[in-house]
Amino acid sequence: MKYFLLTAALLAVLARPARAQTTPAALNDAAAFQQGTFQGAAADQAHYAVTYQLDSDDPKLIQQTLRNIGNALADERLKGKLTVELVAFGNGVAVFRKDQPYAAQLAALKQQGVILAQCQNTMREKKISKDELLPIISYVPSGTGELIIRQAQGWALVHP
């Protein structure tokens, strides 16, 4: 009986409903939302970093990813505070191929400081040479390794 009561008490404590964040920023955001004045989170940090993951050769997904990167770079809250990396691996290598229509968009993103990184494991597995890829890109040993490292460094990860 003693164990039953102890177990019941423990379950009662653990079964409490989760509470929403109660940080001052979260409370202010909630109040602004209720009043219809919420305009997005405040970018109160000095610097932000994000890695976009691209592992698909679907043209719509590639365009969406490039558009998402452009939108982040154009966000007034993040101006001068944002570092962006695009990591392509698997079928995502299509974005960096010379025979694909993305060169101008990628050059514009690189001009804005975006790191364009291709997984070398993918190149080996698919037997793709650097000559087949745009000369403006960089190379990383492993695309997933890059994501793991960046996340551990505090970078946000986006996989459109």
Ranges and model annotations:
Residues 82-96:
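Acidic helix-start/capping segments at beta-turn-to-alpha-helix junctions
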Residues 50-53, 85-88, 115-118, 159:
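Structural recognition of the beta-strand scaffold that forms the well-ordered cores
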Residues 7-14:
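Bacterial N-terminal signal peptides
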Residues 1-4:
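Positively charged n-region of N-terminal signal peptides that target proteins for export
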Residues 16-20:
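Sec/Tat signal peptide C-region and signal peptidase I cleavage site
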Residues 56, 91-93, 123:
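Short, glycine/serine-rich, charged loops/turns that create anion-binding
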Residues 23-85:
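N-terminal secretory signal peptides
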Residues 23-26, 97-160:
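A cross-taxonomic marker for long C-terminal extensions/tails that follow the last structured domain
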